[in-house]
């Protein structure tokens, strides 16, 4: 399983309301793209799905974020389990300053796996899942910092996969990459949806239209429109959506 249901979510930074009455169902094993102009709330919303906003002292939320019908903001919800089930890939590749192997093994070790055979199998499976195994299999002891930007981002995806999550959150994962590396990541994302629910923030509307099944358009902290990507881009119901995707603003 791996389905998020968000109900009447409001998020505040002090007195400033960054998200307003967000209600959305994010379907399992599909790619949902979050689009909208800078400052519209899409990255803030993404971070509510694994409670990264907890790190901001002035932040508080109202409403519910349900993962398979369990409220992740409930005091009874296990935060470590949330981090295991919901992986995160950031805009800038952020490998740890350690070997390729240790980058991928880091998460499983944190969750208590120490057996070398089990770790070896997880590392290989994760690197294969991130479509980078063939490029690094003979250099697993090499520093991750020596990889190219595109390889580092795929390594970060492998690191997220290694804890065997149900859901992957991606915050503009290709914005710092060249076009060839971007294409590899896009192909990889489409392969990953067979096994994972994927929610991706992107400023690149062409990317959203290429790879996603569903699209949510954010504006000033609200969702103006959510639906099948083909419908949002070819027959939007909200004039603001049409204005944005046609380039009239943003």
Curated annotation (Swiss-Prot):
Pfam families: ABC_tran. The keyword Magnesium does not apply. Gene3D superfamilies: P-loop containing nucleotide triphosphate hydrolases. Residues 4-245 form the ABC transporter domain. The keyword DNA-binding does not apply. Keywords: ATP-binding, Cell membrane, Membrane, Nucleotide-binding, Phosphate transport, Translocase, Transport. One of its GO terms (cellular component) is plasma membrane. It catalyses: phosphate(out) + ATP + H2O = ADP + 2 phosphate(in) + H(+). It is found in: Cell membrane. Belongs to the ABC transporter superfamily. Phosphate importer (TC 3.A.1.7) family. This is Phosphate import ATP-binding protein PstB 3.
């Amino acid at each position: 399983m791996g389905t998020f249901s968000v109900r009447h979510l409001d998020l505040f930074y002090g007195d400033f309301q960054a998200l307003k009455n967000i209600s959305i169902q994010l379907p399992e094993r599909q790619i949902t793209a979050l689009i909208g102009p800078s400052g519209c709330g899409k990255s803030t919303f993404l971070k509510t799905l694994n409670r990264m906003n907890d790190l901001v002292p002035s932040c508080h939320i109202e409403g519910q974020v349900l993962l398979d019908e369990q409220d992740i903001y409930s005091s009874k919800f296990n935060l470590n389990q949330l981090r295991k089930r919901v992986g995160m890939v950031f805009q800038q590749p952020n490998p740890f300053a350690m070997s390729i192997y240790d980058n991928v093994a880091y998460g499983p070790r944190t969750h208590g796996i120490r057996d070398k055979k089990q770790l070896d199998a997880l590392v290989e499976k994760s690197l294969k899942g991130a479509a980078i195994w063939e490029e690094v299999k003979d250099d697993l002891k090499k520093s991750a910092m020596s990889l190219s930007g595109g390889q580092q981002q795929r390594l970060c995806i492998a690191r997220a996969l290694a804890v065997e999550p149900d859901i992957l959150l991606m915050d503009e994962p290709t914005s710092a990459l060249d076009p060839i590396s971007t294409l590899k990541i896009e192909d990889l994302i489409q392969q990953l949806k067979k096994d994972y629910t994927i929610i991706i923030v992107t400023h690149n509307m062409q990317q959203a239209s290429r790879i996603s099944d569903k699209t949510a358009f954010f504006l000033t902290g609200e969702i103006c429109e959510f639906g099948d990507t083909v419908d949002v881009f070819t027959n939007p119901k909200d004039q603001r959506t049409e204005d944005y995707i046609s380039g009239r603003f943003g």
